[in-house]
Amino acid sequence: MADFKSKNGMNEVEYNELQNEMDRLANIKWQGYAKTIKEVGVSYLGAVAQSAKLRHSLYHKVSTYGIYLASANLSGFNVCPNSEYCKDNCLNGSGHNRLDRLSKKGSIDRSRIIKTRLFFANREVFMRIMINEIEKKRKKAE
């Protein structure tokens, strides 16, 4: 545990907050999409064409579902294997997220952190939410 804290640059308070959040997420049970996503604390897990990059696929009549997770060790977990080389220039701080950070809201980062932690704390619920969202988008695309 001490290695995890030092590796992620966390103090005792931050580490305890992370543990509490991970416990909360780990104990979430599937109750249907709407109830579960509300309990997780985000509006959605992923979406089709939610960014300028993903909207380009619509020009080719392809719906691309994407999930934005927290970059490098922002969530306490690293989901980017190359972050050591690029975290200083990461696109995580660009676009709408840059505006959100400048306005001091932090809601985009907070949402990405929750999604990333859910992935590690409760993979079953994460996958059920993701599959549910993809199925909804697939039906709409047909």
Residue locations for each model-derived region?
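Class I S-adenosyl-L-methionine
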Residues: 1-142
